[in-house]
Amino acid sequence: MSELCPCGSILNYHECCGPYILGTQVAAKPAILMRSRYCAYVEKNVDYLIATWHPDCHAQEWRESIIQGFTKTVWHGLTVIADTPGRHPDEAFVEFIARFTDADNAQITAMHERSRFLRIKEHWYYIDGIRPSLGRNDTCLCGSGKKHKKCCGR
């Protein structure tokens, strides 16, 4: 039986993000790495997340914190908004919205980020991200249809 990939593509997991997480393929584009990292969060695969963080981040130091985060979070979906080049060929940005539920709050919440990726020797790595500002009167990203100030922005 085939299983759709959690990243939101219409592909089977083993034809989409699975090969990247298993290490049999290398993500050729930052958006692919972004999607596979989302799947790693869904699967609670700390090793893949650490391996795809830029070496300057020293992500291995956060291993326990990442694992603790897994116990509190259920992921509900990913929407990639934009995939844009950076200032040089080895930099790129991926803007996305990821929906999740935290154990401390039963309501679906959304995380909106513009992630920055750097390439080292044909491998892309996540280095950091910024959260674009959302006005209180904007529609909430979680998909509720409510204004941000009446929903996740409280």
UniProtKB/Swiss-Prot annotation:
Note the superkingdom of the native organism: Bacteria
Transmembrane region positions?
A: none
List the Gene3D superfamilies hit by this protein, alphabetically: 3.10.450.50
Q: Which SUPFAM superfamilies match?
A: NTF2-like, Sec-C motif
NCBIfam families on file: PRK01617.1, PRK01752.1
What the entry lists under PANTHER family is as follows: ADENYLATE CYCLASE-ASSOCIATED CAP C-TERMINAL DOMAIN-CONTAINING PROTEIN, UPF0225 PROTEIN SCO1677
Q: Which family does it belong to?
A: Belongs to the UPF0225 family.
Can you say what this protein is called? UPF0225 protein YpsIP31758_1970
